Swiss-Prot record:
Belongs to the FNT transporter (TC 1.A.16) family. It comes from Escherichia coli (strain K12). GO terms for molecular function: formate transmembrane transporter activity; nitrite transmembrane transporter activity. Residues 47-59, 134-151, 201-225 are periplasmic. The gene is nirC. GO terms for cellular component: plasma membrane. Its main location: membrane. This is Nitrite transporter NirC. It comes from the Bacteria. It is a multi-pass membrane protein. Keywords: Cell inner membrane, Cell membrane, Membrane, Nitrate assimilation, Transmembrane, Transmembrane helix, Transport. Pfam families: Form_Nir_trans (PF01226).
Length: 268
């Protein structure tokens, strides 16, 4: 039932590992692109959200954030939160090693950070209408995120990436417009519910940092948020999705390392 999708994920993990090993610059550029694409979505939804009544703000922001993951998937790029799922399948299927997984994940995260900050810088240099006004929701939301309790951030991070990886998983299992509908629904649920995505937060934090933020907004607070949200994102991508669907697949139908590697070799 899930074998074909797991094979796609494991094959993508092998592709990611090859790109990282054979073309490190290309891997970092592609990772930066993912951070930038998510950042463009963040700028969009906060621009709209800043104009709206709080009662409808979560719905509208959630309904328009689908552009972020659509760009990542359709244009192609390396997103940390998706990699937590892909690389887990790769390890279980034998297409990559544990060592490769733990070497690639931090590189992807840092590449995403570069792209996220770059987009925020461009927005700031371009006038950044959200940034000079201290009452902008960019500043209030960023501050609230950096002062939230660790366990709140951790579990909101877990719920968030469960939805993000479900969007990616369903996009792999569908064709045509169904891909976009799957992405749209999952990201609507993530944003409207107020969950935490480490890469999306990177651009938000950079935007507030470049603007007229409160003195209570600190680098330590940003680090606090990104640490716990990243851990929560990793839990759901690797365990809820990667291990979850691996063990939901009957053992006889799971990819076997030798067979998978033979398929990869035959495919070039």
């Amino acid at each position: 039932m899930f074998t074909d999708t797991i094979n796609k994920c494991a094959a993508n993990a092998a592709r990611i590992a090859r790109l990282s090993a054979n073309n490190p610059l290309g891997f970092w550029v592609s990772s930066a692109m993912a951070g930038a694409y998510v950042g463009l979505g963040i700028i969009l939804i906060f621009t709209l959200g800043n104009l709206l009544d709080p009662s409808v703000r979560p719905l509208v922001m959630g309904a328009t954030f689908g552009i972020a993951l659509t760009l990542v998937i359709i244009a192609g790029s390396e997103l940390f939160t998706g990699h937590t799922m892909f690389l887990t399948f790769g390890v279980k299927a034998g297409s990559i090693s544990h060592g490769q997984m733990w070497a690639i994940l931090p590189q992807t995260w840092l590449g995403n950070l570069v792209g996220s900050v770059f987009v925020a810088m461009l927005y700031s240099w371009g006038g950044g209408s959200l940034l000079p006004v201290d009452t902008s929701i960019v500043h209030s939301v960023a501050l609230a995120k950096t002062t939230a309790p660790a366990m709140v951030l951790f579990f909101k991070g877990a719920l968030c990436n469960w939805l993000v990886c479900l969007a990616i998983w369903m996009a792999l299992r569908t064709e045509g417009a169904a891909k976009f509908i799957a992405i749209w629904w999952c990201l609507l649920a993530f944003i409207a519910s107020g969950y935490e995505h480490s890469i999306a937060n990177m651009t938000l934090f950079a935007l507030s940092w470049f603007g007229n933020h409160s003195e209570a907004y600190t680098l330590a607070g940003i680090g606090h948020n990104l640490l716990w949200v990243t851990l929560g994102n990793t839990l759901s991508g690797a365990v809820f999705m990667g291990l979850g669907y691996w063990y939901a697949t009957p053992k006889a139908n799971r990819p076997v390392a030798d067979k998978f590697n033979q398929t990869e070799t035959a495919a070039g």
